[in-house]
Amino acid sequence: MTPKKGKKRVKKNIATGIVHIASTFNNTMITICDASGNVISWSSAGARGFKGSRKSTPFAAQVAAGDAAAKAMEHGLKTVSVVVKGPGAGRESALRALSAAGLKITLIRDVTPIPHNGCRPPKRRRV
């Protein structure tokens, strides 16, 4: 078998970064970038093995945030500013998981897009 070809992950030494939490009704995605926007690590509830409706739970967001934080701290990340987007259930639990992992949060910014009467929303569910 030929040896596996691919980029060897270079260990960067980054002290501060930006965490983007995209929380939808179906999933929670966490991306950790440096100051210029290069991705250091990422994780999501689906990537951590949650399937279907379990992806949208706060616990799945907590696991995904802890995983992304652990990967980023291998590169020397210590302080982060957080950008939260979306209406999902995993917003607060992802924030708590980041601080519990040992990252110092300096700023929390909510950039959830709010329409000024744009597209028609999906119809209401009748259960």
From Swiss-Prot:
Pfam families found in the cross-reference section: Ribosomal_S11 (PF00411)
GO cellular component, one term: ribosome
Gene Ontology annotations of biological process type: translation
GO MF entry, a single one: rRNA binding
Designated name of the protein: Small ribosomal subunit protein uS11
Listed InterPro entries: Ribosomal_uS11, Ribosomal_uS11_bac-type, Ribosomal_uS11_CS, Ribosomal_uS11_sf
UniProt keyword annotation of Translocase present: no
Superkingdom in the source lineage: Bacteria
Keyword field: Ribonucleoprotein, Ribosomal protein, RNA-binding, rRNA-binding
Name of the gene this protein is made from: rpsK
Main function: Located on the platform of the 30S subunit, it bridges several disparate RNA helices of the 16S rRNA. Forms part of the Shine-Dalgarno cleft in the 70S ribosome.
Subunit composition and interactions: Part of the 30S ribosomal subunit. Interacts with proteins S7 and S18. Binds to IF-3.
Keyword RNA-binding: yes
